[in-house]
């Protein structure tokens, strides 16, 4: 049976929600974007279009990985932090949204220090805070 991007998204979101994944809406969108090689804007634009059987299979593989407990950031290999897209692998911790508060405070302190201020990001995992600052 032919499936649209919208139906595939809704099904993926429902399965993630049923599994107790809090950010099911965001994660379903990220998995579909990754599987289809589309930006968020392209995905929203194409919601009424039909998907190929190959794309359905690809999304199913990704959903199975997620349901097995693999974080979506590791599946797609990218995560956004403070508006910056970062390459992510299992070698680094996934930047968390609450760490953006730390980045914001560091930015404010750096600005307050003026031109002579310096910032050192030492042994900081992915380096996301240093990049944001």
Model-derived regions, located:
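Alpha-helical structural motif
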Residues: 1, 8, 55-59, 68, ...
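Non-catalytic accessory regions of SAM-dependent methyltransferases
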Residues: 1-42, 48-51
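A general structural signal for well-ordered alpha-helical segments in protein cores
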Residues: 9, 28-29, 59-60, 72, ...
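Generic leucine side-chain signal with a strong bias for well-ordered alpha-helical environments
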Residues: 16, 26, 32, 43, ...
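Conserved AdoMet
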Residues: 32-109
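Conserved SAM/SAH cofactor-binding pocket of Class I
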Residues: 100-133
């Amino acid at each position: 049976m032919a499936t649209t991007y919208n139906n595939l998204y809704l099904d993926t979101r429902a399965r993630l929600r049923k599994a107790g994944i809090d950010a099911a809406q965001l994660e379903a969108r990220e998995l579909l974007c990754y599987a289809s090689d589309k930006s968020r804007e392209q995905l929203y634009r194409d919601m009424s279009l039909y998907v190929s059987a190959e794309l359905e299979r690809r999304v199913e593989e990704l959903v199975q990985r997620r349901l097995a407990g693999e974080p979506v950031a590791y599946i797609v290999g990218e995560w956004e932090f403070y508006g910056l897209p970062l390459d992510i692998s299992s070698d680094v911790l996934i930047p968390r949204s609450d760490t953006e508060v730390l980045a914001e405070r560091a930015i404010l302190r750096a600005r307050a220090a003026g031109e002579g201020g310096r910032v050192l990001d030492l042994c900081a995992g992915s380096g996301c805070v240093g990049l944001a600052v």
